[in-house]
């Protein structure tokens, strides 16, 4: 079993409520980077667990004008994952300045 699969299973055990439905997807982003994501839409709030830069990142659903936006509800800095119409992007949200720095801008689900 690969390290990535083990990490995803651990994330699910930690993040998902008992009996919650999950959806696992891997996105192919710019520069050829793969981003595995496990969505837990039945959690309250809904969550996404991403494996990026060698770490598991747990994000919660956030208000968005369109699409599904995940971040961390605080005044500090955090990753932000935004999925809209089959595409996604990952950025770093700087809490103090409210600036968004793109990390991966064109992520599409792998077949």
Residue ranges and their predicted role:
Residues 21-111:
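Cysteine-centric segments in proteins
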Residues 1-2, 34:
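Low-complexity, intrinsically disordered short peptide segments enriched in small/polar/basic residues
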Residues 2-10:
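Sec-dependent signal peptide recognition
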Residues 15-17:
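N-terminal signal peptide c-region/cleavage motif recognized by signal peptidases
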